[in-house]
Design a protein with these regions (language model features):
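Nucleotidyltransferase catalytic core that binds NTPs
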Residues: 1-184
Length: 184
């Protein structure tokens, strides 16, 4: 039996906005994910803490954003809030998060969702270039992270990766290791 795939969308969510929810819903729908765990970063190492709302408040705001107001269509049940980051040592590193997530969800497969800008700078993250060893990626293009940049980043960090041509949904795929891939 193949494991079910769960999306993981991390971020400070300071504040949560409709773009976060639309992105998570679109990825869940396009890739037929079981659900997407929205994971507020407890103590982000790349961002100064000035102006950062407390972790518990950001979690509450995110949970509130997923609640369905009266007389509205139901929110997407595939979106769930996870507080796992709050249980881990600080600062919050994606490597630690994915490692712990995999321990707790051994029968499921993670699909880490991140923006093109973040993907281009994985080499600055704690064990960032090792992340393809423990998770698959969905890289969401932004205005500065076009297809050429995606290909260049893959080639620079993982020269043995195999990149496919865009499919019918205009998704590129890169097989980074024998077991992990990256969609753009």
């Amino acid at each position: 039996m193949t494991p079910e795939t769960i999306g993981i969308l991390g971020g400070t969510f300071n504040p949560v906005h409709i773009g976060h929810l639309r992105l998570a819903t679109a990825v869940a729908e396009a890739l037929k994910l079981k659900h997407v765990d929205l994971m507020p970063c407890a103590v982000p190492p790349h961002k100064p803490d000035s102006g950062l709302l407390p972790f518990e408040m950001r979690v509450s705001l995110l949970q509130g954003a997923l609640e369905t107001p009266p007389n509205a269509s139901p929110s997407d049940a595939r979106l769930q809030v996870s507080t796992l980051e709050g249980e881990l040592p600080h600062p919050s590193y994606t490597w630690n998060l994915i490692t712990e997530w995999r321990k707790r969800h051994a029968s499921e497969s993670p699909m880490f969702i991140l923006g093109g800008e973040d993907f281009m700078h994985l080499d600055t993250w704690h064990r960032g270039l090792e992340l393809p060893n423990i998770t698959n990626f969905v890289v969401v293009p932004r205005c500065q992270a076009d297809e050429e940049t995606f290909r260049a980043t893959i080639g620079r960090h993982w020269p043995k990766a195999v990149i496919t041509e865009p499919d019918e949904n205009n998704l590129l795929s890169a097989a980074i290791t024998d077991e992990t891939s990256c969609l753009y």
